[in-house]
């Protein structure tokens, strides 16, 4: 309800991966959608397609994603640190391109992507980076069998996957370097919202005991 009201008042909704469909199903048609992952199964995340949505797709994404988005509002962005494609990018753009820095997940890169596009205030929903009931707010079978570990932030315990934990570590590193350039609010009671209050206390449980 909070996000619905904010959208009605003019706040653009930016979705990543499977949250695009989740938003569409709940009356929150996104203004934009971002994808980073190169695996082919991610092409399902762009559906249902919308003529009103701007699709920001990383150049490393699977070709089928670009095929499905033909005729839609599509922007291609490039990841900083992707040294394999540096020669190709220089051949195409010369020195006139600006790769997007950030962590290894789509949410972390999206913060920097939209900061580069002029946005300086972000309110992030569903960015828990831990398991609260299930690993995602919607079905995503690709993550069903991932190993679960216990982590601690300021004496509060969280269950998360190795990917969640790595993302949390990258979040601390990223905001430590670039956090002064944007205003970031993370909603909810997940791992990330607690890290913001206690950025130096993230540990695996066995390191604490």
Residue positions per predicted region:
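Metal-ion/cofactor- or nucleotide/acyl-coenzyme-handling active-site neighborhoods
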Residues: 1-209
């Amino acid at each position: 309800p909070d996000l619905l009201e904010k959208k009605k008042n003019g706040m653009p909704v930016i979705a990543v991966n499977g949250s695009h469909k989740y938003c569409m199903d709940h009356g929150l048609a996104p203004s934009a959608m971002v994808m980073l992952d190169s695996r082919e199964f991610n092409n399902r995340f762009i559906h249902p397609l919308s003529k009103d949505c701007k699709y920001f797709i990383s150049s490393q994404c699977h070709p089928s994603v670009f095929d499905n988005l033909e005729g839609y509002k599509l922007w291609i962005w490039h990841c900083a640190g992707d040294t394999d494609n540096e020669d190709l990018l220089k051949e195409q753009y010369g020195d006139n391109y600006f790769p997007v820095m950030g962590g290894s997940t789509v949410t972390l890169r999206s913060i920097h992507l939209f900061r580069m596009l002029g946005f300086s205030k972000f309110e992030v929903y569903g960015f828990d980076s831990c398991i609260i009931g299930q690993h995602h707010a919607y079905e995503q079978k690709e993550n069903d069998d991932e190993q679960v570990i216990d982590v601690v932030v300021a004496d509060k315990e969280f269950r998360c996957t190795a990917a969640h934990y790595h993302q949390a570590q990258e979040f601390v590193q990223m905001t430590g370097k670039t956090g002064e350039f944007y205003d970031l609010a993370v909603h909810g009671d997940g791992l990330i919202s607690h890290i913001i209050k206690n950025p130096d206390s993230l540990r695996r449980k066995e390191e604490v005991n």
